[in-house]
A protein has these predicted regions:
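A conserved ligand/cofactor-binding region detector
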Residues: 1-249
Length: 249
C-alpha cells in the first residue's frame, strides 16, 4: 500500500500539506490494510488467552516496526517535512489495561504472533479504561479515559451472541484488534462489548449507575467495588467475558 495514495484518497492533499491528525488516520488505514494482507497464523490446535485486561499501549509505531516499514515511513514523512514522533502523539492509547496482569497478557499476544503460533486473545472492550489522572489546584481528580474513535484499531465483526443472565439477556458484539508479529502473521485480540452500552451514564468524575448492567457493563475496567453494587458488577463483567469466550471457542 502506498501512503501518498491513501492520503490523496482521504484528503486530496500531498503529505506535506496534511495535519498530523490527517496523517495519523492515513497511517492507521495503511497499517490495518497491510495487517489484513499478512493473514492469521494457522494450525490444528488453537490457543485462547482470556484476560480481564490487555495493556497493549499505543500501536502505530510497534505495528510499523513489526511490518518492517518503520524507517521507510519515517524517512518518507521527514522528506515531506513531517515528524513521525509528532504524529504518534495524536494516537490515543487503548484503555484496555492498567497493571502487570494487562502488560503480561499483551506480551503473551506479541509472543504468540511473533512465534507464528495459532492463538488469539479474548477480553472486554472497555470504553473508559480505569481512569485518567488529572491535577487541578494541586488536587488529583479522576476522569474517564476515552479512546474509541470513529476510526481506530478496532474492527467491528459480525460475531454476536445472546448472553443469558438471571432475569435478563445481553446482546454482545465482538470487535477485533490485529496484533502483528515481527516479520510474521497476525494474532487477533477479540474484545466483546455490549450493544446497549450507554456512555451518558457517567456523571461527575467516574461516577455512574452501577445497577444498570445493560448499559454499564463495559464502561470501566475494574469499576469501584467498595460496595455490593460494584462487586456484583465485576462478577457480571467476568461472567460476560468467559461466556462470550466459550461461545467463540
Amino acid at each position: 500500500m502506498n501512503l501518498q495514495e491513501i492520503v490523496t484518497k482521504r484528503t486530496g492533499k500531498a503529505i506535506s500539506q496534511c495535519s498530523n491528525k490527517e496523517l495519523y488516520f492515513s497511517l492507521l488505514e495503511m497499517t490495518k490494510g497491510l495487517a489484513e494482507e499478512k493473514g492469521s497464523n494457522e494450525g490444528k490446535r488453537k490457543l485462547y488467552y482470556i484476560s480481564a485486561e490487555f495493556l497493549i499501549g499505543k500501536l502505530l509505531s510497534n505495528n510499523l516496526i513489526n511490518l518492517g516499514i518503520y524507517e521507510d515511513v519515517k524517512k518518507l514523512l521527514a522528506d515531506n517535512g513531517k515528524s513521525l514522533a509528532e504524529i504518534e502523539e495524536v494516537e490515543p492509547e487503548p484503555s484496555l489495561g492498567n497493571g502487570g496482569l494487562g502488560r503480561l497478557a499483551a506480551c503473551f499476544l506479541d509472543s504468540i504472533a511473533t512465534l507464528g503460533l495459532n492463538g488469539d486473545g479474548v477480553g472486554l472492550n472497555y470504553h473508559y479504561g480505569l481512569f485518567k489522572q488529572v491535577f487541578e489546584n494541586n488536587l488529583q481528580h479522576e476522569t474517564p479515559n476515552p479512546w474509541i474513535e470513529k476510526e481506530s484499531w478496532l474492527t467491528k465483526t459480525d460475531r454476536a451472541y445472546t448472553i443469558q443472565f438471571g432475569g435478563f439477556n445481553l446482546q454482545s458484539r465482538m470487535y477485533d484488534i490485529d496484533v502483528l508479529g515481527y516479520n510474521n502473521r497476525t494474532t487477533k485480540l477479540h474484545l466483546f462489548d455490549v450493544e446497549t452500552v450507554d456512555e451518558s451514564l457517567v456523571g461527575e468524575g467516574i461516577d455512574f449507575d452501577k445497577e444498570d448492567i445493560k448499559k454499564n457493563l463495559t464502561l470501566f475496567l475494574y469499576p469501584d467495588d467498595s460496595d455490593d453494587k460494584g462487586r456484583i458488577l465485576r462478577v457480571y463483567q467476568q461472567y460476560f467475558m468467559v461466556s462470550n469466550a466459550a461461545r467463540l471457542i
